[in-house]
Amino acid sequence: MQPAGRKLAFVLASSDHGTMIVNRLDYRMVDAERGYGVGFQILQTAAFDVAEVKLMVDLLTLRRKHFGDGVVAIDCGANIGVHTIEWAKAMTGWGSVLAIEAQERIYYALAGNIAINNCFNAVAVHGAVSSESGILPIPNPNHSVSSSFGSLELRQRNGNEFIGQPIDYQNTVNVRKLTLDEFSLPRVDLIKLDIEGMELEAIEGASRTIAASRPIMPVEKAKIDAAQLRRALEARGYEVIEAGINVLAVHTSDGTLAEIRPEPQLAAQQAPAMA
């Protein structure tokens, strides 16, 4: 074998979530001591956002309590699958997960993590969730350069977040653009939207699904117009609970709402950053 001198980015880590494929370079340092990124947090603490993961599992358990077995959760912006894995393990025998990730290299890690953790009730899809079907050119970052890859915005705008490396929006790869309505799922209990500025488009593309199933929706608002997000959710009959850089939207007809309402203060204190 002729050594190629390659930098190794993706590694296996024995984490509290199970054996996980992580990018050891998935970080952006804020200063000499502090950084962020899914891989960074797992390698530093053996887990990613434990409080938020527990909250999501608790929400799924509540939906089972009120609506019975067959719970379905959609993880949009699944990254390497921390939420997907934890949800799938928790729902063994009574629920399933659809995980969607737009970045190809991260999608490979997501699919591998589903397989290596034997989550037979989870499915991974490579695509960008939007308001319409088609093809979306997205930037192609260097995964061997330290960056917070989960913070990558698929579209260029004024004020794109710096993730740790310059992003060339002319150097793109095509990815499938899809709507959640395309899946025609008969039941959906939770839709997590953490897709770096495309959350409003995803809601529009899930109009039929939302109207039919009235799922709980944790939505990141950091890179979109928060007032517009609130209006879009309230117009669909949702109560919007503030939770740091996210909102938790629960339909006013949902029997779980009365049990969820006491949680906003705790959720805001945690200020979760979904991934």
Model-derived features with residue positions:
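Short catalytic-loop micro-motif centered on adjacent basic/acidic residues
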Residues: 73-75, 97-100, 190-193, 217-220
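S-adenosyl-L-methionine
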Residues: 1-103, 108-113, 117, 163-170, ...
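Conserved S-adenosyl-L-methionine
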Residues: 125-127, 238-246
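Short internal loop-to-helix segment that lines adenine-nucleotide cofactor pockets
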Residues: 37, 41-72, 135-137, 151-213, ...
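A SAM-dependent methyltransferase catalytic signature shared across enzymes that methylate proteins
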Residues: 119, 231-242
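Short, conserved active-site loop motifs that form the nucleotide-linked donor/cofactor pocket
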Residues: 95, 122-123, 188
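Hydrophobic pocket-lining residues within nucleotide cofactor-binding pockets
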Residues: 78, 127-131, 180, 195, ...
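Core alpha/beta nucleotide-donor-binding catalytic domains of modification enzymes
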Residues: 111, 115-143
